[in-house]
From Swiss-Prot:
The species this protein was found in: Sulfolobus acidocaldarius (strain ATCC 33909 / DSM 639 / JCM 8929 / NBRC 15157 / NCIMB 11770)
Enzyme class, UniProt record, top EC level: ligase
Keyword line: Aminoacyl-tRNA synthetase, ATP-binding, Cytoplasm, Ligase, Nucleotide-binding, Protein biosynthesis
Protein name stated in the entry: Leucine--tRNA ligase 1
GO cellular component: cytoplasm
Enzyme Commission code(s) on record: 6.1.1.4
Amino acid sequence: MDFLNEIASKWQKVWDSERVYEADVDRTKEKKFITVAFPYTNSPLHIGHGRTYITADIYARYLRMKGYNVLFPFAFQFTGTPILSIADAVKRGDEEIISTFTNVYQIPIGVISKFSDPSYLSAYFKEDMRNTALTLGLSIDRRREFTTIDPAFERFVQWQYKRLQEIGYIKKEKAPVAYCPVDEFPVGMHDTRGDIEPEIIDLDVIYFQGEKLLFLTATSRPETIFGAVAILINPDSDYSIVVDNKNGKRLVMSTEAFKKLSFQMSLTEEERKKGGELIGLNVTNPVTLKKLTVLPSKYVESKQGTGVVMAVPAHEPLHYLALSELKESFEIVPVIKSEDYGDFPAMEVLETAQTTSAQELKDYIDTLYRIEFHKGSIRDEVVDLVPDYMKQFVGERIAGKSVREARSSVVELLRNLGVHGNIYEIINGPVYCRCGAEVVVKVFDDQWFIDYSNSTWKSSVLKSLDKIEILPQDAKREISKIIFNMKPRPFTRSRGLGVRLPWDDRQIIDSLSDSTIYTVFYIVANKVKSYPTSILNERFWDYVVLGRGDSSQLSRELGIPKEQLEELRMEVEYWYPVDSRHSGRDLVQNHIPYYLYHHVGVLGEDKVPKRIVLNGFIRVGGKKMSKSFGNVYPLNKAIREYGVDTVRLALTSTSSLSDDIEFSPNIAKSIGEQLKHIHDFIENLIKLQSVNEIRKVDLWISSLISEYIDLIDNCLSNLDLRTAYKTIYYDIYEDLKDYLELGNGKINSDIIKNVISVWIRLMAPFTPHLAEELWHKLDNSLVVRQRFPSKGELQYDKRALLEIEYLRYTIDLINSMKSKMSKEPETVIIYVNEDNTQRDLIRKAIESLKERKSLPDFEKEVGDREMARLAYEIAGDLPDKIKNLAEIGINESEILTSNAQFLLNKLDVKEIYIYNSKDPSTPDIKGKKSIALPYKPGIILT
């Protein structure tokens, strides 16, 4: 909306010129350090970014108003494959990427062509993001801005990794790693399309010797080798005959497997054949020494494993189907027994499932595997299947043992026979790199790893979680589990933008690994930029960040004035640790645990963040926002269409923190219209005729808004933005409309000025631009520099609050009844009960509820079970405002009678009759007179 964006632009310029968000050390104030996960500069900010950044900004603004010295900085991630893959895609003319930039983000094609240069791409989007952050009204201290390729930041990260290496948390070893064959470096979740973390498993490989060739079979169940009766391959797929350069063996595997396994083994392809050309060849089962035939099967997927399968029809339904479809007899050799299945589990599964679809059988097969592994044991008869020289080993180590125990012994047997190996597979594949290539597993001989499996380190990180408040609370368990299961992680790349590994400048530290303790760098970023990088050595950072060393000696060594060094150290001591770390919930899988590990490892357990806030996703069109769904919504577009403050509310406050938020045009338009209504309403309200006396209705509105202050204060403290949003932008608006109606269109200007002052300040964290515009109708100061409201600012009268709230409660009861009627009523009859004995009983019931007493306990206390139950029911249904004020006596008849016109207007009826149910002369219509109770009038609608 133009109106909202115009006032936003106006006040942003004022705030910028006044430098209201710059934060420096102030020992007279308690500090709060708020940070968000910084963005990759590979495309414009979208509304998903907006949710996280605005949530943090609302919290930062709230804390400033509470009197804290708040630092909220921002920076830009230039490192990693997200940027490199976009640059490469533009370079090769990727139509999808180019179309997204032109059609979704409205970037000129002449600019897009320059994105093939990663440095230009990053710099362009850095400026775009900076401008968007300003447009969004983020209250950031822009002096502390940096990028991850700034020279000073590079020295900071290099210092961090030298520290980790010295402690022993960095290691170099041979290991399997998810790898992009095109970009030629390891990949993780942030490097893949859809942000999928490649999950690597190892598979056992068994060699089946043929006359001239070895058929390489991959399996997750090597113990079933005793029941292997054939070799299965896909006749329509390509198969490669390859030489293992390590031992000269000639192996058969699918061509797709050869391409993948070439990254794990040294292989040379000799020949390529169709699978059908290999059908009929014979091989030997290395354990039973039986001759097996190579047979065709459509169920064999050449992409999985080696594309060669040992057929075990007793325990694998798909193998049984494959052999059955050949219309020839075949042997079935059971190997595993369990109480859940008979002698031939595969046949039982097929009979139960009543399908031959591999997809439909998957869950049944998974269940069979799981039960046989956890509950099964190897049959004693397997001893009879092996030659004499194996019988002792099989009899003692395998036969009769649980499958869990026997599996390792079978592997040992196969290794002793020289027919066992291992390969690695991405179990959740196919996973694609951002460049479009399918991710494979590569075995590195000299890959650098961060040893997240180190037991001492891991234990300290888990312990540190006790010091951290995590919102939502259920995320702490998830984070604990992820930390507990963490393994060594490769953290370097061979190309791209980023920080060079200090002891191997051929390697670049990846984007998840250079963004771990970078929040410390914010504190000194604005000052160290001016220093020559040569003096930003380990001793500099040891002193500034850790307080190690002597400032006088360091000053002489580095040529930096001692006072400057001590000031830098003092700033770190003042601001750190982070008080609230904000990110999307997706970063629980990687960034958040890495962030904690590195804080504990480098800075110590006492420097972990005090709070971690994880928000849900944004959905567009009912789906999680994703490029693959074509529903990416640029933040700038949303702001242009709906207005800054509308977007701030729509992206943060229409759902609870952990839930996803649906961003839709209808919701955004509705919010924008409500903001305009509020603006116009306040503008008109302060112009209305004032009365001199303070009326009951004036005391009511003042008291009611006073009650809201604590509610909203608590909501903002705990980031319950939805409740605060509803209260500020809808409840208070409706309350003030009722105030005008109850006050016959007149106001008490002193009361209302104070009420509006509070209302505007309650808006300020959420919609700062609208709040600033409205504030200047009352005052010439800046609302962003005002204190958060306190209850003491407004007059408070319990009786006035209770009486009007009782009136509104009665209206709610009647409207609830109206909603269930097929015809609109014209007349309302209300019976009120003024019996003090019954009123006292309901008060007692309210107290019992507050004390969490049970109904049986209350019944014993009262003695009269029926009356106790009624009182308890009424007390439970009362709004909190009435419960909290119930100790005050009120005259229900007088309240309703004196506000009869208001009732008529609000209920839209022609007549209203109010009776005292205890008056003998009162007519009893439809028996409602006798059932009226205090706080629960008898109501008839006709």
